[in-house]
Structures are given as C-alpha cells and as structure tokens.
C-alpha cells in the first residue's frame, strides 16, 4: 500500500511540475531511484547488480601506493573509467524514463 502511495505521489509531482514533460531528465538516487524503477518496470521487475565495494581492497595497497594516491588524485575519476551502471546513469547524472526502462526485465 505504501509503495502505491509513493508511486502516486511521484506521478503527481511529475504531472504538476511546470514546463516539465514525463521524459524530463532527473537525478534519482537511493530509494527514489528504486521507487522510480518499480513504477516504470511494474510487474516485470528490474535488473540491478550493485558494484563491489572497493574499500576492503584498499588495505591490500602498500603504504607507498596509498600515499601516491593521496598526492596525485585524479582530476576526474570518471575520465579514467567508463561506468554504465544505473547509479552512474541516474544518480550522478540526470536520466529520463526511457533510461529507466533499459533496466526493466
């Protein structure tokens, strides 16, 4: 029941947003992203595999490597990696309903 209330609220907000159509790009993160996927994908469900957390792996770096990382941080880490996950596509950058549909089963 609560999900449908949230979904209806999201639809109302989208419909009442001035000058915004349903395909307008938005930043969606966390529970808002999950709710939007449930709303867009419905009973089909959606596919999402979270990326592995690298924090536990940092302990395997030698102290010199860790210091080098602090001294020479990348200007923009997204330049070094091509990321294609839904979080990168819809949270870090704005996405639209068509982008969300790509993650439906």
From Swiss-Prot:
GO cellular component assignments: extracellular space
Known PROSITE patterns for this protein?
A: INSULIN
Q: Which UniProt keywords apply?
A: Carbohydrate metabolism, Cleavage on pair of basic residues, Disulfide bond, Glucose metabolism, Hormone, Secreted, Signal
Family annotation (InterPro entries): Insulin, Insulin-like, Insulin-like_sf, Insulin_CS, Insulin_family
Q: Which positions make up the signal peptide?
A: 1-22
Disulfide topology? 29-91, 41-104, 90-95
Q: Which SMART domains match?
A: IlGF (SM00078)
Query: By its UniProt entry, which Pfam families does this protein fall under?
Result: Insulin
Pro-segment residues? 53-82
**Gene Ontology molecular function: any one:** hormone activity
Q: Which GO terms describe its biological process?
A: glucose metabolic process
Subcellular location(s) of the protein:
Secreted
The entry sums up its family as follows: Belongs to the insulin family.
Q: What does this protein do?
A: Insulin decreases blood glucose concentration. It increases cell permeability to monosaccharides, amino acids and fatty acids. It accelerates glycolysis, the pentose phosphate cycle, and glycogen synthesis in liver.
What is its quaternary makeup?
Answer: Heterodimer of a B chain and an A chain linked by two disulfide bonds.
Q: What is this protein called?
A: Insulin
Q: Which organism is it from?
A: Oncorhynchus keta (Chum salmon)
Its gene is ins
């Amino acid at each position: 029941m609560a999900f449908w209330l949230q979904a209806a609220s999201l639809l109302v907000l989208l419909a009442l947003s001035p000058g915004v159509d349903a395909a307008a790009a938005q930043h969606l993160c966390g529970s808002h992203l999950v709710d939007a996927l449930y709303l867009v994908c419905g009973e089909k469900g959606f596919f999402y595999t979270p990326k592995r957390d690298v924090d536990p792996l940092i302990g395997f770096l030698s102290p010199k490597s860790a210091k080098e990382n602090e001294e020479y941080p990348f200007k923009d880490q997204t330049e070094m990696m091509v990321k294609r996950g839904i979080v990168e596509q819809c949270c870090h950058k704005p996405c639209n309903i068509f982008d969300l549909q790509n993650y439906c089963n």
